[in-house]
């Protein structure tokens, strides 16, 4: 289990270290945004009560490993996976490891929506544009994947469209 001091550091651990941005985003801000998107997706699908709360908590803690390890670029995570290492499991510090496949997909879609939106809004320069393009491609590839539940595809597309048009998700 992670110590409270490390959890509280999440607000000071930066993301997007390899991209120029108009401002710094912390791991805590990212996880909070992902939780709001996940909550919206749950409501869109009709998930509520304890199940929604569990998914929101999972979204609030999904990148807690990065408080210790720092933000890892996707390419690094891919290379670790190729080596048989799950990057989000490098530090077994969070009790809310996502085991339910549906919840895992929902949080991943919310994570990609948040990342694509944030780098679109705050990225500067050609590299940030490329990262935004890659992130959007990953998002839409996942949403169009036949293995992804159609309710998740619908909820993800709704959340993406609302965010792009500046609508509140709450």
From Swiss-Prot:
Residues that coordinate or bind dATP: 15
Record-linked InterPro entries: HD/PDEase_dom
Annotated SMART domains: HDc
Pfam families given in the database record: YfbR-like
Catalytic activity: dATP + H2O = 2'-deoxyadenosine + triphosphate + H(+); dADP + H2O = 2'-deoxyadenosine + diphosphate; dAMP + H2O = 2'-deoxyadenosine + phosphate
Key words of the record: Cobalt, Hydrolase, Metal-binding, Nucleotide-binding
Signal peptide positions (record): none
Names of the cofactor(s): Co(2+)
Any GO MF annotation of the entry: metal ion binding
Protein's job: Catalyzes the hydrolysis of dATP, dADP and dAMP into dA. This step is essential for Z-genome synthesis (containing aminoadenine instead of adenine). Specifically removes dATP and its precursor dADP from the nucleotide pool of the host, preventing the incorporation of A into the phage genome and favoring the integration of the Z-base into the viral genome.
Family: Belongs to the Caudovirales dATP triphosphohydrolase family.
Protein name as catalogued: dATP triphosphohydrolase
């Amino acid at each position: 289990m992670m110590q409270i001091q490390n959890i509280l550091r999440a607000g000071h651990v930066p993301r997007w270290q390899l991209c120029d941005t108009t401002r710094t985003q912390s791991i805590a801000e990212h996880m909070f945004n992902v939780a709001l998107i996940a909550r919206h997706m749950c409501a869109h699908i009709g998930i509520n009560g304890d199940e929604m709360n569990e998914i929101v908590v999972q979204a609030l803690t999904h990148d807690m490993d990065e408080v210790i390890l720092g933000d890892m670029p996707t390419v690094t995570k891919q290379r670790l996976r190729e080596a048989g290492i799950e990057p989000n499991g490098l530090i077994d510090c969070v009790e809310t490891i996502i085991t339910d496949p549906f919840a895992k997909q929902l949080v991943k879609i919310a994570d990609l929506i948040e990342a694509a939106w944030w780098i679109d809004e705050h990225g500067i320069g050609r590299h940030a544009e490329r990262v935004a393009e890659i992130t959007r491609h990953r998002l839409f590839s996942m949403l169009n994947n036949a293995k992804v539940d159609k309710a998740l595809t619908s909820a993800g597309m709704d959340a993406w469209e609302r965010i792009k048009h500046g609508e509140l998700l709450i």
